[in-house]
Amino acid sequence: MITLASFIFLILTALFILQSMLSSSIQNLNIFLLAIIALSALSLLFQIRAEWTDIKRVIKGKAISLERSLVYTLTALTGGTYLTFFLNHSIGMGGVLASSAVGLIAAWAFKKYAAAIYCGSFIGMACSIIFSNPLSLLLASIISGTLFILSSNMFVGFGGKLGFMAFAGTYSASAIIGTPLRTIDPLSRNLYFLVFLFVIIAGMATYFLQKALDIDAVTASALVGLVIALLFPDATHVVVVAAFCATFAGMVSPDRVTTYRQMLFLSILTGMLFVAAFSLFDGSGGKLGAIAFLATVSGSGMITGLKLIRKRLNRSTEKSYSI
């Protein structure tokens, strides 16, 4: 029952984000983004239905028991949160540099708990004004950590899942403590070209490191994010942030996305959703991963749907020839 509840919570969170994007696009009269988001929402539902068979098997399986390793996982995630928050705000590294550095350290020194630490690092990217109380970060970490443990067998192999859980934790914590997330101005259209360029480069590079060089997903994402942040003149620039978002899409398993063409499509979709969500949920941790998660899940649904349409067209063509 708890596993089912966590699944429903994740789905409702995803739909809430897409609904917020739709409302923002309507207010800004952006018809193109409105159509893309609507299609993404439909594809998300399609993909969820496809995942339901695996999820039912998880729900019917043995319930998760409180083991020492789970306590270590929650501790690792919380540690990643506070370390990144410290590097981000007290040292002044900025969110991308801090998170990617923590991710690399985790992948190399604490491989077993690298995913949990990296998930926590996204919470640590949250705004210090909204999460000024250390206990609010702890609350966000506990919520995200619980979701991390309960959803370990859900949506396996999709990019952005870690950030999506971090977003669910920070958004829930901000609502509980009464410090709502902010809404800012939409992304300037003058930045569209650079944003999409770096999104494609970062997404494809991360996927390449996984597929061609057999590097684990956390290392691939953190390494690409760190390199771009160090090479760009301003490590906190929106272009760097967008590129970091794309690295999470690039964390998608090569078993899920089998070709570079499919990854290119997911990278472009990530860029579109990044633009659509830019003004929303400012100050939250995990927002970038949530965008990537929606892009990879809904994008996979689009790819699967297109394959089904092609199969049906081929069958109808074969039947017409046989007649």
Please identify what each model-predicted range represents:
Residues 1-45, 65-100, 104-178, 187-199, ...:
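C-terminal transmembrane helix-loop-helix hairpin of multi-pass membrane proteins
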Residues 55-64, 181-189:
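Flexible interhelical linker loops that connect adjacent transmembrane helices
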Residues 202:
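Interfaces that engage single-stranded nucleic acids at replication/repair/recombination sites
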Residues 43-55:
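Membrane-water interface of transmembrane alpha-helices
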